């Protein structure tokens, strides 16, 4: 339980996936005290993944309401006080948060689920009309409206958001160029075989991919908005829509002002507690000690947000444990789905399984230990990989390289050999 003998009021700053899930999990576990969920956005708490996928494509049947995690009546029914406003200050001594409008909320335990913000592009013209980032529902609505009339889009950054938007833009009939500073797409998150697949996928769809290129300036005027992107080598790319997708920066300002340590995010231990035992940090903003990997991590995924929220809810209702959930991620681009199980924290060998160039998995090993699996259009491999990694089922590169090897078959053989159900 929290520091007080009786259940104390909980204030959650941030109403994204992590913040919402914390409030919901607390009520599911019977937490009786007051719960205040503070949102800096006007919208009800909503799902973010569809923003760069189905929602962005402008499908008529996909409404804003379909993004909602719960309708407004849920918060009333569960006695969750949903407050709109921006928190300006945390007073850890008085255990109070103060909003920009001057209102304040006392807490027995504070949960910081403040997320992250898009990294800006520091070049001339970055504030021209028609230059977008994609993080919030408002961002997505603006992009969707621009995409309806845009003819030429330039995407700066070939990460998940950039490529998902590029796919949606091409499917909308827009000409698309992706500019990436590194030598391949998704360079920080996937192996070369997987990156090469997505290069082929986007080029087959008609997208121009430019690697090893920086942006020098964005051109346009107040009347027309953005009209071109100037590359570092002097080339000019015509554009009436530009998406900046070069990553995000965790929101750490509130924590730093409150005297909490910051280390690549709001620093927390394996139980997601900050240096103040009355303050937790979770989700995209939290740099945490992961029991599986040892080092401090900051992960950006729905799975991580939900797992963090549930752990905090458990701790506040009497069960304290370290966070050790296996990370997993996914991305949909055109008709292709990439799923990643585990985390590549340094591998020294790879094994590719699958003969189809459009459906394969890459197994990442460090020594004799499987660390992560990337699966392209092979959902059964992804599920088997998660079970293998979660349960620590042994697998060597030699075994994985056998001609008839499958992840599902290996899992079944190990299950039979141990007599333990691994389903």
Give the location of each predicted region.
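A Rossmann-like FAD-binding core segment of flavoenzymes
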Residues: 32-34, 81-98, 105, 172-270
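Rossmann-like NAD(P)H-binding beta-loop-alpha module
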Residues: 142-190, 194
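FAD-site-proximal beta/loop scaffold in flavoenzymes
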Residues: 127-151, 222-230, 235-306, 311
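Mid-to-C-terminal Rossmann-like scaffold of FAD/NAD(P)H-dependent oxidoreductases
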Residues: 1-9, 15, 28, 285-383
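FAD-binding core/adjacent interface of flavoenzyme oxidoreductases
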Residues: 1-13, 70-154, 230-232, 236, ...
């Amino acid at each position: 339980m929290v520091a007080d003998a009786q259940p104390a009021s909980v204030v959650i700053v941030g109403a994204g996936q992590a913040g919402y899930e914390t409030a919901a999990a607390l009520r599911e576990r019977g937490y009786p005290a007051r719960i205040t969920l503070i949102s800096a956005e006007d919208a009800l708490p909503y799902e973010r993944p569809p923003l760069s996928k189905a929602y962005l494509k402008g499908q008529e049947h996909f409404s804003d309401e379909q993004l909602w995690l719960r309708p407004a009546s849920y918060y009333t029914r569960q006695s969750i006080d949903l407050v709109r406003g921006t928190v300006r200050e945390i007073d850890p001594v008085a255990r109070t948060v103060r909003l920009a409008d001057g209102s304040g909320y006392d807490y027995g335990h504070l949960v910081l689920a403040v997320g992250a913000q898009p990294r800006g592009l520091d070049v001339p013209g970055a504030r021209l009309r028609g230059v977008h980032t994609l993080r919030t529902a408002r961002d997505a609505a603006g992009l969707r409206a621009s995409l309806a009339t845009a003819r030429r889009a330039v995407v700066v950054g070939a990460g998940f958001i950039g490529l998902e938007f590029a796919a949606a833009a091409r499917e909308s009939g827009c000409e698309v160029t992706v500019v990436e500073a590194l030598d391949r797409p998704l360079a920080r998150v996937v192996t070369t075989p997987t990156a090469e697949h997505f290069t082929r996928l986007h080029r087959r769809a008609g997208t121009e991919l430019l690697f090893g290129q920086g942006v020098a300036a964005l051109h346009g005027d107040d009347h027309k908005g953005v009209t071109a992107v100037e590359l570092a080598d002097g080339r000019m790319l015509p554009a009436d829509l530009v998406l900046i997708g070069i990553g995000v920066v965790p929101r750490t300002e509130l924590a730093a002002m409150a005297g909490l340590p910051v280390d690549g995010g709001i620093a927390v231990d394996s139980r997601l507690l900050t240096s103040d035992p009355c303050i937790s940090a979770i989700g995209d903003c939290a740099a945490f000690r992961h029991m599986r990997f040892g080092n401090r991590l900051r992960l950006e995924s729905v799975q991580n947000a939900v797992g963090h929220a549930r752990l905090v809810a458990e701790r506040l209702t009497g069960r304290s444990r370290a966070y050790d959930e296996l990370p997993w991620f996914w991305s949909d681009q055109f008709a292709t789905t990439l799923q990643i199980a585990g985390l590549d924290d340094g591998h020294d060998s790879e094994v590719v399984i699958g003969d189809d160039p459009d459906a394969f998995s890459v197994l990442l090993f460090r020594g004799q230990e499987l660390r992560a699996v990337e699966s392209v259009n092979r959902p059964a491999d992804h599920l088997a990989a998660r079970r293998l990694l979660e349960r620590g089922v042994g697998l060597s590169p030699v075994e994985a390289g056998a001609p008839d090897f499958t992840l599902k078959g290996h899992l079944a053989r190990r299950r039979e050999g141990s007599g333990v159900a691994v389903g």
